[in-house]
Amino acid sequence: MLTADDKKLIQQIWEKVGSHLEDFGAEALERMFITYPQTKTYFPHFDLHPGSEQIRGHGKKVANALGNAVKSLDNLSQALSELSNLHAYNLRVDPVNFKLLSQCFQVVLAVHMGKDYTPEVHAAYDKFLTAVAAVLAEKYR
């Protein structure tokens, strides 16, 4: 459960992400593909080289979806419903992969936010990304 303080920290950091959506999303995907190579199986049609247009494009989609979730912190299920349906019913992505990508996104934030990525921010984003992963996995039950 996100507290009012968590929500405030999440929104403050997300404002700083702003113009870096595509970069951060792509970097998170690249980190996931390197750290968890089994995740590449869901992208057989992608050029998986770092910086490829396909990774950058999908990274932007990921970051935009997270941005949408940040705007809807009080109703993540509704905000992510279509995305959950897509991944569960059409793409059939193993839901464990949402957690893996969340971890990689945390690393990207920590690297780029520097001293602004305090332990409190880390904890808030951990709760937020865990909630996002749980919502995306809801349709699998």
Curated annotation (Swiss-Prot):
Residues at which heme b binds: 58, 87
Organism: Struthio camelus (Common ostrich)
Role summary: Involved in oxygen transport from the lung to the various peripheral tissues.
Gene3D superfamilies: Globins
InterPro entries given in the database record: Globin (IPR000971), Globin-like_sf (IPR009050), Globin/Proto (IPR012292), Hemoglobin_a-typ (IPR002338), Hemoglobin_oxygen_transport (IPR050056), Hemoglobin_pi (IPR002339)
One example of a Gene Ontology biological process annotation: hydrogen peroxide catabolic process
Globin domain: residues covered: 1-141
The protein's name in its UniProt record: Hemoglobin subunit alpha-D
